[in-house]
Amino acid sequence: MASLSGPISPTNLEMFKPGVEELNPSKLLLLSNHQEGMLYPTILGSLELLSFKRERSLNLQRDKVCLLHQESQLLKLRGTGTDTTDVLLKQPMATSVNCCHDGIFTIWEQDRMPKTSMAPTLTESSGSLVTRLMSIPRLTFSIGTQVAMRLFRLGFRLARYSLRVTILKAQEGLLLIPDLLHAHPVEPLVQDRVVEPILATEPLPLV
């Protein structure tokens, strides 16, 4: 065995060379065609690295590739009061040609993406809501009043207390409706309508 302190011959240098398997151009072409859609460069190395890339490419071919390169467009909308939740869900699935090197995530199927926005949407304005609430037949209120008075006369303390609280909160809401209409202008029909608070015809009995 040659001494380590002496000069190292070329034959001894062969012992320190890492074992790298050379690949012919035809095999490299086959690998590049097989790894279609992958944007990382092919590095000549051991077969373990190539087998890892081959397995990863098969998994990506089975999945659909979704990109994050359009995030920069959404960042421009941030701070302007624009809700980007719906925009994120409606971004089309891009092809592998536009893949970013550092931002790739995969999903199983594109069809399983939620089609609707998760943000709550208002289906009607406050004016139409007030109009709909005030168009409830008076028969409903009369029936409720009769039931409440019967429960008051029966003497159930808990029922009387609950009904009294409910009636007081309803009267408070009716008193606040005109102020809310002036503070928040809505449709002209609601603005022109005179909203008068409904006063109780009988004093509420004490609980």
Swiss-Prot record:
Q: Which family does it belong to?
A: Belongs to the coronavirus I protein family.
Give any extra note attached to this record: The gene encoding this protein is included within the N gene (alternative ORF).
Q: Name one GO cellular component term.
A: virion component
List the protein's name: Protein I
Location within or outside the cell: Virion
- Look up the domain of life of the source: Viruses
State one Pfam family annotation.
Corona_I
What is the species of this protein?
A: Bovine coronavirus (strain LY-138)
Q: Which UniProt keywords apply?
A: Virion
Q: What does this protein do?
A: Structural protein that is not essential for the viral replication either in tissue culture or in its natural host.
